[in-house]
Amino acid sequence: MFYTHVLMSKRGPLAKIWLAAHWEKKLTKAHVFECNLEITIEKILSSKVKIALRTSGHLLLGVVRIYNRKAKYLLADCNEALLKMKMTFRPGLVDLPKENFEAAYNAITLPEEFHDFDTQNVNAIDVSEHFTQNQSKPEEITLREDYSNDLLFQAGSFGEETEILRRHSFFDDNILLNSSGPLVEHSSGSIAGEKPLFYDSEDGFGDEGAAGEMIDNLLQDDQNILLEDSHLNREISLPPEPPDTIVVEPDNPEYIRLPENGKMDETLSNEEEGFTLDPIDVSDIAEKRKAKKRKLLIDPIKEISSKIMHKQLTSFMDTLMVLELAPPTQRLMMWKKKGGVDTLLSTAAQDLTHAELKMLFTKCFLSSGFKFGRKLMQKESVREEVGSKNIVETSVMEELNFQQDLNQSKTWKDVIDGSKCSSHEDINKNINSEQDIVEMVSSGTEESSSMNAILAQEIENCTVELESSGNEQNIETERWNRRILQTLNSLRESNKMGMQYFSLMKLCRNSDRKQAAAKFYSFLVLKKQQAIELSQSDPYADIIATVGPMFYKM
């Protein structure tokens, strides 16, 4: 049977149809009502995926079953609605008896009842009593007025008896020195008799009973009386607790304060008791915990700051380098090569062309009497140069031995003749080169004052420099020419003996890497000069040389 995901997936458009065709018990009422048969039939007829004939038959079976279910549900709903309509609308049948066809009047009518509320007599309200509820007694809202015999110091004062002596402005000089003033007429005895005016009952300041004497002393301009021993030796008692009863001082019988009414004292005592507050329990107040000092912890910077990032973006040190140009002339190039400390301390002042003379010169530095600061470095450089020269000489000797094995004694004569000729040519060239070097050194000492003058003269004397430059290059080229000629002569001798092919591997047998490289280079130079022809079968295979057109003409 042909199945597709359109039929088997739970959310597919034909999933319910497929379920109805194969598993009708799984269909619910919601599935039946949600299914739109018109759309599903169109999808079956014009589906995007080709459906097999048997599969389409199963789908049509599912459509028929869903349609049957819908028809059953519709029929059941219609029957239920018809039954309810028949039960509700019954012509001529009423559930109530005939007597109760109409409702009673009292059952459908609310009673009208007017309640009689008790009204109060307005005239019976005592307005005066209502307003006197918030009135207080005159004694409670009126200050007590105490009048004494002397009205001099009480005039204009309002309960400030204790502050009189503390104010300097009250005893101005114009009042004390005025002859017409009332203070002049008073005597010391009269002032002493007025102690109750200044005396505050045991205020604890130590001046009890001495207020009048203080004023008398001030009027008499005697300042030392206050420091008498009689006043200092008096015992002053601390103020006792205020008793409930009125205290009458025995020393001051004149100053007695009596309340006008007993009720006023009672109200005052009640007010004092009412306004005194109980002490607060300290244990109830929670002590504030002392906050611990927090240490200032600063995180290390783990990100690249904007300044560093901008600096990295704008720096071109990695991509840009200083332009190092070669010297413009060959003489300056030679000075740069030979101007180092190693070459100056290991070679002579003049350029010695012969290898034996250089060897003799370097042997002088190997003596025990040579003591400088950089002795070890110089010895190492000298040893390296000596070793390199010895390697060159040993390679030449090994080549000569190899040629001796292959060739006859005639090749030795050719080599000796060639070396003699080259030595004569070297001597002639060295004479000219020594003269050029002397001129170069003398001109270099004169031109060391300024670089611009050197460059100008170097451009003018370009032809002279070409003649005197490159003695070392000439030596190297002569060495390579000698080796190439030796290789060519050995190949000629082998060809005369009947060999038509020359193998590079056989020639390089029992040779080190440097000798093999020299022989390979000689083969390449001979190939360039068309003296031999080279061939190789495979990469990294043996190189075979054959006779070329210029083999005997060079």
Curated annotation (Swiss-Prot):
Meiosis-specific component of some cohesin complex required during the initial steps of prophase I in male meiosis. Probably required during early meiosis in males for separation of sister chromatids and homologous chromosomes. Replaces RAD21 in premeiotic S phase (during early stages of prophase I), while RAD21 reappears in later stages of prophase I. Involved in synaptonemal complex assembly, synapsis initiation and crossover recombination between homologous chromosomes during prophase I. GO terms for cellular component: chromosome; meiotic cohesin complex; nucleus. This is Double-strand-break repair protein rad21-like protein 1. Pfam families: Rad21_Rec8 (PF04824), Rad21_Rec8_N (PF04825). InterPro entries: NXP1_M-like (IPR049589), Rad21/Rec8-like (IPR039781), Rad21/Rec8_C_eu (IPR006909), Rad21_Rec8_N (IPR006910), ScpA-like_C (IPR023093), WH_DNA-bd_sf (IPR036390). Coiled coil: none annotated. It comes from Ailuropoda melanoleuca (Giant panda). It is found in: Nucleus; Chromosome. Component of some meiotic cohesin complex composed of the SMC1 (SMC1A or SMC1B) and SMC3 heterodimer attached via their hinge domain, RAD21L which link them, and STAG3. Keywords: Chromosome, Chromosome partition, Meiosis, Nucleus. GO terms for biological process: chromosome segregation; meiotic cell cycle; replication-born double-strand break repair via sister chromatid exchange; sister chromatid cohesion. The keyword Nucleus applies. Belongs to the rad21 family. The gene is RAD21L1. One of its GO terms (molecular function) is chromatin binding.
